[in-house]
Amino acid sequence: MLLMNLQLFATKKGVGSSKNGRDSEAKRLGVKCADGQFVLAGSILVRQRGTKIHPGQNVGRGGDDTLFSKVDGVVRYERVGKNKKRASVYPIDVEEVIAAE
């Protein structure tokens, strides 16, 4: 009786799956209105996570910590103390803005 020791090899290489390859969408956070810019009531000033910038005069804070203007006016970003920032909106007449331009 003839004994054969036969070794079979794979004809196709097994391909492993990568555990990377995913990423979340960017949230587009940051300052939306510059210092000295004229804004209308309801305009978003800053999109942020947490209170990196605190609400000041005539500025409201949304549920996701977004800062928005409560009145028409000019945006001002101010330092409060050593490492705290505050956004305020100071109301001015629209006629003054048009005359200045």
Swiss-Prot record:
Work out whether the entry's keyword set contains Cytoplasm: no
MF-aspect GO terms: structural constituent of ribosome
Q: By its UniProt entry, which Gene3D superfamilies does this protein fall under?
A: 2.40.50.100
PTM section of the record: The N-terminus is cleaved by ribosomal processing cysteine protease Prp.
Q: Which Pfam families match?
A: Ribosomal_L27
Q: Which UniProt keywords apply?
A: Ribonucleoprotein, Ribosomal protein
Q: Which GO terms describe its cellular component?
A: cytosolic large ribosomal subunit
GO biological-process terms attached to the record: translation
PROSITE patterns in alphabetical order: RIBOSOMAL_L27
Q: Which InterPro entries match?
A: Ribosomal_bL27, Ribosomal_bL27_CS
PANTHER family per the record? Answer: LARGE RIBOSOMAL SUBUNIT PROTEIN BL27M, RIBOSOMAL PROTEIN L27
Q: Which family does it belong to?
A: Belongs to the bacterial ribosomal protein bL27 family.
Q: Which HAMAP family match?
A: Ribosomal_bL27
Name the UniProt record assigns to this protein: Large ribosomal subunit protein bL27
